[in-house]
């Protein structure tokens, strides 16, 4: 596991490369890497994260959708307990997020569609939030507009770099 390797080599930081699931796994492991606890203790059992046990993470996303590269939330599945829950803590924010649209050029159309709709869902959720700021509403509207304009283009022509750039922009 990520956590086991981090502890074996006494990692000072980690680089997560991928979409939402690999990002979330790495965030959870980084949050407790210097300690001796198990992820389940924090994820399923509610143990508090000690920021002194965390190591920094660099997030390199290969999709445009989950926004995991810029959040402090990690959604994991505990298969033994049949639970899918979020864990979150300020220690889980990636220190650096690298969003390079060229890394999304090989994403299959069905993943492009589902992550693109995830971007739209995030934009609508942010816009409709009970507590929000006007700047957030403006960003949400802008993001939704980008999705409506560019998602179909990215889906129909996966190697359209401009469409991929605009979807990456919409996702953050």
Where do the PLM segments sit?
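Glycine/threonine-rich beta-strand-loop-alpha-helix active-site module
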Residues: 3-99
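Carboxylate- and glycine-rich phosphate/diphosphate-binding segment that chelates Mg2+/Mn2+
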Residues: 73-172
């Amino acid at each position: 596991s990520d956590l086991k390797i981090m502890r074996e080599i006494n990692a000072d930081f980690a680089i997560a490369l991928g979409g939402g699931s690999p990002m979330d796994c790495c965030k959870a492991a980084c949050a407790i890497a210097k300690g001796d606890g198990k992820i389940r203790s924090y994820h399923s059992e509610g143990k508090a994260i000690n920021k002194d046990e965390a190591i920094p993470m660099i997030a390199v996303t290969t999709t445009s959708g989950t926004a995991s590269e810029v959040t402090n939330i990690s959604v994991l599945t505990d298969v033994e307990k049949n639970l899918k829950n979020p864990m979150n803590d300020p220690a889980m924010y990636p220190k650096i997020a690298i969003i390079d649209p060229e890394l999304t050029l090989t994403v299959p159309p069905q993943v492009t569609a589902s992550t693109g709709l995830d971007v739209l869902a995030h934009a609508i959720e942010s816009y409709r939030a009970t507590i929000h700021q006007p700047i957030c509403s403006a960003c949400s509207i802008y993001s939704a507009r980008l999705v409506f304009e560019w998602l179909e283009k990215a889906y129909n022509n996966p190697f359209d770099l401009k469409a991929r750039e605009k979807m990456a922009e919409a996702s953050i």
